[in-house]
């Protein structure tokens, strides 16, 4: 509640904040005037002055202190008329002390605010530097060029929403004639998701040479390893497929990931749906794998939810229907051209709305 109220105040125009501070001072002066002489309101005047310094600036704080002094002079003059025995010299001395106290208070608070802002600025610079380094490192983790696969034209891309991505894609050469295609989406955003993504990639690359029993066995091993390394609320959806050039077969496993679309030359669109929960969600899972054959002209599109859940300014989602429509209308294009067309369509749909999630695509076109 308090952070929201502070954020609300920071959004207000300066003149409104100054008016609030000065009205606050006036209200205290009125209470001070009607209160008995033995009651001191000095500590209460600190609050509106602090408000002005913190939300507007030192000049506004000094203005508030000057207005306080003006009210004190006015009150002392009225008190002198009401109490002729009151010594004005003592009153003037008290006024000077109070004014000096408020002026010193304004200066101390202003310096404290400057120090905090400098520290926050330095911390922001350090964070941006770390994010830049992480982004450069992550860029090297993604494939630098499209794989050369006989009978398959492949292209992948990732457009992070916030500097570093929690999405992942990769092309891994296996034994001769076989290639692995991976797409993952780590829950969350920013650096924590990027770190888990790097862990997923490292685990995949180390396990892919050990799992000889197919994609389902690899997914089970990945799930066990990821669950042991992360908290229960950290998980990743994952799609892993192995393309065998000789029989032109695609053997795949889907761990809670968005169902990829497979456009056949006949015009039919098949969905390669989930065959188990996301990686890391539960400790031991027996995943199921499936195999299909790719004929020349078939197009496989693997995507993350940053594509289908992109929203426009009216908060309407791009949706899988639009993606399927683009796939049907442009299935004859190369893998790279189709990737670019999908991303361009998503950005045009958003129409200036901020990108809220990473956009990752892999297109594989049989030839």
Residue ranges of predicted features:
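Short, Lys/Arg-rich, polar N-terminal cytosolic tail immediately upstream
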Residues: 1-11
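Transmembrane alpha-helical core residues of multi-pass small-molecule transporters
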Residues: 67-71, 93, 97, 201
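Juxtamembrane or sensor-core-proximal signal-transducing alpha helices
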Residues: 3, 99-122
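Hydrophobic transmembrane alpha-helices
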Residues: 20-36, 49-90
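… and, occasionally, acidic/histidine-rich disordered N-termini of signaling adaptors
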Residues: 118-301, 338, 344, 348-367
């Amino acid at each position: 509640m308090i952070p929201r109220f502070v954020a609300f105040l920071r959004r207000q125009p300066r003149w409104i904040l100054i008016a609030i501070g000065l009205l606050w001072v006036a209200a205290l002066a009125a209470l001070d005037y009607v209160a008995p002489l033995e009651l001191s309101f000095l500590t209460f005047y600190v609050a509106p002055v602090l408000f002005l310094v913190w939300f507007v600036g030192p000049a506004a704080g000094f203005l508030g202190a000057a207005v306080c002094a003006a009210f004190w002079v006015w009150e002392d003059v009225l008190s002198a008329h009401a109490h002729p025995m009151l010594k004005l010299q003592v009153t003037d001395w008290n006024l000077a002390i109070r004014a000096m106290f408020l002026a010193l208070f304004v200066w101390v608070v202003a310096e404290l605010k400057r120090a905090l802002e400098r520290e926050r600025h330095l911390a922001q610079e350090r964070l941006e530097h770390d994010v830049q380094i992480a982004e450069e490192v992550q860029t090297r983790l993604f494939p630098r060029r499209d794989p050369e696969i006989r009978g398959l034209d492949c292209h992948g891309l990732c457009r992070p929403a916030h500097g570093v991505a929690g999405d992942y894609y990769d092309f891994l050469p296996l034994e001769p004639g076989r290639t692995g295609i991976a797409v993952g989406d780590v829950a969350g955003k920013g650096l924590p998701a990027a770190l888990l993504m790097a862990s997923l990639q490292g685990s995949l690359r180390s396990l892919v040479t050990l799992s000889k029993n197919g994609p389902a066995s690899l997914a089970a091993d990945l799930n066990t390893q990821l669950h042991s390394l992360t908290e229960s609320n950290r998980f990743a959806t994952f799609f892993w497929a192995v393309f065998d050039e000789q029989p032109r077969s695609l053997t795949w496993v889907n761990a809670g990931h968005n169902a990829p679309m497979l456009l056949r030359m006949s015009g039919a669109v098949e969905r390669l749906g989930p065959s188990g929960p996301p990686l890391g969600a539960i400790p031991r899972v027996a995943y199921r794998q499936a195999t299909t054959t790719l004929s020349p002209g078939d197009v496989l599109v693997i995507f993350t939810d940053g594509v289908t859940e992109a929203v426009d300014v009216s908060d309407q989602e791009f949706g899988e229907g639009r993606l399927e429509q683009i796939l049907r209308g442009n299935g004859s294009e190369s893998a790279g051209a189709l990737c670019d067309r999908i991303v361009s369509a998503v950005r045009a749909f958003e129409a200036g709305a901020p990108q809220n999630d990473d956009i990752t695509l892999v297109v594989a076109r049989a030839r």
